[in-house]
Amino acid sequence: AGRRVVLIQVTSGDRGSPDRDAAPAEVAATREAEMREAARRLGMAEVVFLRCPDGELMPDLSLREKIVRMIRTHKPDVIVTHDPFRPYALHPDHRAVGLATTDAVYPTARDPLYFPEHLRDGLEPHKTAEIWFFGPEHPDRVVDITDVFDRKIDALRAHASQVGDAEGLEERMRDRARELAEGEPFELGEAFKVVQMRR
């Protein structure tokens, strides 16, 4: 509560459909509409779509520049992103975004000689205090989501093209959140790996 949250969606998921006859542009439009609705349900201030090609992301300088531009535009204290260091089952785009975001935060967004064209656009360097990696293999922070769990499920249900009728979704998510909260003074938890960045 009291925080301004901006969601940056790097791809629009235009290839993320099991329907071989689906038009990628229609898939992307559906995914973007669902993301806007999920963000609305969570009370996010803004959603930005970078519209990079789905399934083609690499943690290269081009992607890093786009993320640095977002950091310098929105000036976040905290960034929440995919944990790129999680082994095995991880979408390659998620891994690329996590790595590019980590490199964008430090040192690139901080130092003015990286992407000097940003200065010409009025975007000043920015130091982000923390990166919170979600879904980590080895979390070091579990946050109490007991009071907001229903909102989380409601937001996930906005992604109807991906979760379908969501049969069993709430039960699976609740079981996982309960596992993560074991030993904590609350019922349901969300796990993160938190990295303090150099200031």
Question: At which residue positions do the language-model features occur?
Answer:
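Active-site rim/loop-helix segments in enzyme catalytic domains that contact anionic ligands
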Residues: 1-74
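Metal-dependent de-N-acetylase/amidase catalytic core
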Residues: 58-199
